[in-house]
């Protein structure tokens, strides 16, 4: 399941890395003005494409909870029992994708179970992720059982979870060490753009008390972990400009635990 806006740069690789591991794709194009919708329409795995009217960044209104509700209802129309969520600028590690169906089989089918993954922000390079401070403690619930009732009344409109209300209140969360890698933290320019976007959307820090400056900060405490060969994602699915990013300085690398 994909919610996207102006992701023509990262979307082709995202679809490539999911293909063959999921049974189908339901997507919502949130008013894109680039080629995002055209890329989705060409995808053989696409079951349904939802859309919002095109809008420029100055006038676009983010309605994340409504988008999520529409996506989950579409997934249910297509017979989905379990949902895997992915952003266009994210890549699941190959180990997780190989184990995906076994992971679903291992979770309780009669309860609103969900699986959380470690969220790894790639930093300055496609082969290293940031692990100091809040960066080393991020996790995301991205695989979950689809509930009968789909609502997001208790979720914030920005940075809210993908889990519907019933799953948050009554479900069981299982925490895994599988990894989800974020691509738009590789380049400094992308980190600054992300910081500026969220600062504009949430100037009073209503949805995140820590604010957003940290998204682009480094400092002397910067610590990176190189991705082990058996924990990698499919780097062939990176956009060309990110494939060319440099490897990290050895002085900021820490030994990565399994």
Task: Identify the function of each model-found stretch.
Residues 79-93:
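Short beta-strand-to-loop acidic/aromatic patch adjacent to the donor-nucleotide binding site
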Residues 65-82:
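Active-site nucleotide-sugar/metal-binding loop of Leloir-type enzymes
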Residues 21, 43-45:
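Short, structured coil segments at secondary-structure junctions
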Residues 23-31, 51-52, 88:
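Short beta-strand/loop segment that forms part of the nucleotide-sugar
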Residues 29-42, 53-56:
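A conserved acidic beta->alpha catalytic loop
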Residues 61-69, 93-258:
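Catalytic-site signature of metal-activated, phosphate-bearing donor transferases
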Residues 1-2:
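Short hydrophobic beta-strand elements that form part
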Residues 6-23:
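Short, well-formed alpha-helical segments that are part of the catalytic scaffolds
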């Amino acid at each position: 399941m994909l919610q996207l806006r102006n992701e023509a740069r990262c979307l082709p690789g995202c679809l490539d890395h999911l293909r063959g591991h999921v049974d189908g794709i339901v997507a919502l194009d949130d008013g894109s003005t680039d080629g995002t919708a055209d890329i989705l329409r060409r995808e053989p795995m696409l079951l349904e494409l939802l859309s919002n009217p095109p809008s420029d960044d100055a006038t676009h209104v983010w309605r994340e909870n409504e988008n999520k509700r529409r996506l989950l209802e579409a997934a249910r129309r297509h017979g989905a029992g379990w949902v895997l969520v992915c952003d266009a600028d994210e890549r699941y590690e190959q180990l997780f994708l190989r184990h995906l169906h076994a992971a679903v089989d291992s979770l309780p089918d009669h309860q609103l179970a969900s699986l959380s993954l470690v969220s790894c922000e790639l930093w300055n390079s496609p082969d290293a992720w940031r692990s100091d401070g809040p960066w080393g403690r991020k996790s995301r619930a991205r695989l979950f059982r689809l509930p009968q009732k789909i609502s997001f009344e208790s979720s914030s409109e920005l940075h809210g979870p993908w889990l519907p209300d019933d799953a948050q209140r009554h479900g069981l969360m299982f925490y895994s060490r599988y990894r989800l890698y974020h691509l738009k933290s590789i380049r400094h320019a992308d980190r600054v753009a992300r910081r500026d976007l969220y600062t504009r959307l949430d100037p009073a820090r209503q949805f995140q008390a820590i604010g957003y400056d940290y998204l682009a900060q480094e400092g002397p405490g910067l610590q990176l972990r190189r991705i082990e060969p058996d924990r990698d994602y499919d780097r062939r699915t990176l956009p060309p400009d990110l494939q060319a990013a440099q490897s990290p300085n050895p002085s900021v690398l820490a030994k990565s635990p399994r």
